[in-house]
Design a protein with these regions (language model features):
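Conserved donor-nucleotide binding/catalytic region of nucleotide-linked donor-dependent transferases
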Residues: 115-138
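Nucleotide-sugar donor-binding catalytic core of glycosyltransferases
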Residues: 1-104, 109, 137-154
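Alpha-helix N-cap recognition
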Residues: 109-115
């Protein structure tokens, strides 16, 4: 098991910043970080998901246009704590995640990847309580989402 798992392309500044920060954190954290050449070109799906499942934290840097990326949802499903980027690839700050979920989310949001060591210190201090809280929230969110869809479908 590791503290942080990340595998991804360096396609824009936010991902470059994360990659650089991860390289400075090996002394105090067990980190598996892989820079890949392209989408799905870094490792097998099995190895990727085994890395996610074995991690306490999975940084979720911004997608190409908005902060959204499926890595955040993979982290939630793999019971890793995502650290959600609040900036777009162009560096614009967005309160995206609370807007998307329609509520205050239990996972951390970040605007400066240089703050990652401080986030890790807090996460480790509260672990595993924080992952239990997040997992309960995520299961309830999915359940409520399903009920809303069924309610609309059934009229």
């Amino acid at each position: 098991n590791v503290d942080i798992f990340y595998a991804g392309q360096k396609t824009h500044q936010r991902r470059e910043e994360l990659s650089g920060q991860l390289k400075t954190m090996h002394r105090k954290n067990k980190i598996e970080a892989y820079d890949t050449q392209g989408f799905t070109q870094g490792m097998s799906h099995l190895d990727y998901y085994m890395g996610m499942v074995g991690a306490k934290v999975a940084p979720a840097p911004s997608g190409a246009v908005i902060p959204d990326s499926f890595r955040l949802f993979e982290a939630l499903e793999c019971m890793a704590i995502p650290i959600a980027d609040q900036k777009t690839a162009k560096g614009e700050v967005m309160e995206y995640w609370d807007w998307l979920f329609g509520e205050i989310t239990p996972f951390p949001h970040i605007t400066n990847w240089e703050s990652l060591p401080a986030y890790m210190k807090e996460i480790k201090k509260d672990y595993p309580h924080n992952i239990h809280k997040q997992t309960a929230w995520w299961l309830m969110f999915k359940r409520n989402f399903k009920l809303k869809v069924l309610e609309q479908y059934n009229g």
